[in-house]
Design a protein with these regions (language model features):
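Glycine-rich phosphate-binding loop used to anchor ATP phosphates in small-molecule kinases
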Residues: 1-11
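Conserved phosphate-donor/acceptor-positioning beta-strand/loop module used by diverse small-molecule
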Residues: 4-5, 15-40
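A secondary-structure boundary/capping signal
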Residues: 27, 89-90
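Residues at alpha-helix caps and immediate loop-helix transition turns in enzyme cores, especially N-
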Residues: 11, 15, 97-100
Length: 153
């Protein structure tokens, strides 16, 4: 079974308790790009609970919630018994698709011989690195630490 809703990262404890030996593929994208995305559904739905006052600067709030949620998910997945964890950065999937897919297939226990075929179907978004072209986003210490934790410069 696979669940691909971004909000599921907030429910690691539930999934770990419900599915012993769960395999968690943590797919994430650079939070700075996410901050400039038009997809603010999660922020609109849960922003008041997670980041009160988010309407003052939605882009900063998007980044903070990205940092909080992804750090929490990674920590929970690593600390909960029985959870296998695999980090897959969207940027790596797009820049090195065969390598990223081979590692993913190995993690889930699928034959890795199909990696090249799957890699040919990867279609990178034009929004990768878009944050570099935008007005600089003020980053909190938490956001900087999360970017570093996940290998973003």
């Amino acid at each position: 079974m696979g669940l691909k809703k971004p909000r599921n990262m907030w429910l690691m404890e539930f999934f770990a308790a419900s599915y012993p030996r769960i395999k968690f593929v943590h797919m994430l994208r650079d939070g700075r790009d996410m901050s400039y995305s038009n997809n603010a559904y999660f922020l609109r739905q849960y922003g008041d609970r997670l980041y009160p006052g988010w309407r003052k600067n939605a882009r900063v709030a998007q980044m903070e919630i990205w940092a909080i949620g992804n750090r929490r998910a990674a920590s929970a997945a690593r600390d909960l018994p029985g959870v296998a964890y695999h980090l897959l950065r969207y940027e790596d999937l797009c820049s090195k698709p065969a390598e990223a897919i081979a590692a993913l297939l190995e993690f889930v226990g699928a034959p890795s011989g199909d990696a090249e075929g799957f890699a040919k179907r990867v279609q990178p978004s034009s929004g990768i690195g878009r944050w570099r072209e935008m007005e600089p986003l003020p980053l909190s210490e938490l956001s900087r630490a999360a970017l570093e934790q996940f290998g973003y410069q």
